[in-house]
Amino acid sequence: MINIVMLSDSNYEYQIRNFIRSLEYAKIQDYRLFYYSIGFDSTIDNPKVIKINWPKDGRRFDFYKPEVCLNTLNYTKENLYFFDADILVSKRFSRFPARYGSSYPLFCTSGVQHPYTFTIDGNGNQTDFNEKNLMNYLGVSERSMDYVLACFFTFDENCRDFLEEYKSFCKNEYMLSKGMHYYAFTDETPANVLLWKKGIRDNYGRKFVNTHKFSTFKVCEENNNIKKTLIDDNFYEQCEDSSEVYFYHGTKVKEENEKILKYIDENS
């Protein structure tokens, strides 16, 4: 049995429903889904879904990630997968090469290795934000490995200490009050910097595709020979190897989702 952890606020519960439909498409039957509904009562009715109403505070719900993972360790201590709500799994997901036993979660690498965001003030001056401020704050001089995305990771009881430290950053009122200065990409920034701080070099590599488009989903599902390709020449839709695409991240556009779900239903 695999144990899945997900969370959302009330606006994104529909994505959890879509994810469950993708599990059926991938023929994943032996699972439990620990679903944390942030500040509301879920209306999902599924015997495989364990619904947990989690209290809401002023943070973005991304920052609840490590604490709900820690809470799930009270239910089960092995074979755990965390997924963001905007993910659909591939038909290949049953073959995902999950590994456990390390003292840290295992993530997938990002196609964008130096992401940044920015603000522009009233005079048109741009200020960029990335992981550098948090690295400097923690005395981390360099990366130990490539940048990873926090949309997915595997973990077990051995990761508890890492998750506790990760949680401490995601609940740190001082750091949170500084906004993008320290956390350019919400919980993902401290996840990366903590991995580098510990000198960790292990990850899954690139095992997914970022996309909101049905056409990208379909072409990757139906072909195993797409290698090192920017789909539609889009830098954000990088496909390293379609035979090892196990899920799709960023599936948020309603019209495109409806096409994907129709395809899933027709091929389940």
Report the location of each language-model feature.
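Conserved donor-nucleotide/metal-binding helix-loop-beta segment in metal-dependent transferases, i.e.
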Residues: 89-129
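Amphipathic alpha-helical segments that form well-ordered structural scaffolds
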Residues: 18, 22-25, 68, 187-197
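PAPS-dependent sulfotransferase catalytic domain
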Residues: 115, 119-152, 188-189
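Short beta-strand-to-loop acidic/aromatic patch adjacent to the donor-nucleotide binding site
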Residues: 77-86
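Short beta-alpha junction loops
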Residues: 37-41, 87, 111-113
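N-terminal anchoring/stem segment of glycosyltransferases
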Residues: 1-61, 74-78, 252-268
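A glycosyltransferase accessory/donor-loop signature
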Residues: 137-149, 157-268
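Glycine-rich, basic loop-to-helix element that forms the pyrophosphate-binding segment
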Residues: 61-69
